[in-house]
A protein has these predicted regions:
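Non-heme di-metal
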Residues: 1-86
Length: 86
């Protein structure tokens, strides 16, 4: 599970990097490609999130697991929100 979560947060960093480039880009074609890449990173993050927490019993998680789950959920919602802004 640690490897999955580590990979999730690598995807998160990649997402924000591509999102930043997308927002700074002035070329319409490149901007479209950067957005597609950011969307792919979001999809990868969500896939890993589902693997890590999809069948998790939230009521029986340790404090650490619960904290990581809550943080990962908040990150996912932030990513969705930021990608909506064009």
């Amino acid at each position: 599970m640690k490897k999955i979560i580590k990979h999730m947060f690598e995807e998160k960093e990649d997402f924000y990097e591509y999102l930043h480039m997308y927002k700074e880009c002035t070329d319409p074609i490149a901007k479209g490609e950067l957005r597609k890449i950011a969307e792919e990173e979001l999809h990868h993050y969500k896939h890993l999130y589902d693997i890590a927490f999809g069948k998790a019993d939230v009521e029986h998680m340790s404090m650490l697991e619960h904290g990581v789950h809550e943080y990962a959920t908040n990150v996912y919602h932030d990513m969705l929100k930021k990608l909506e802004v064009k």
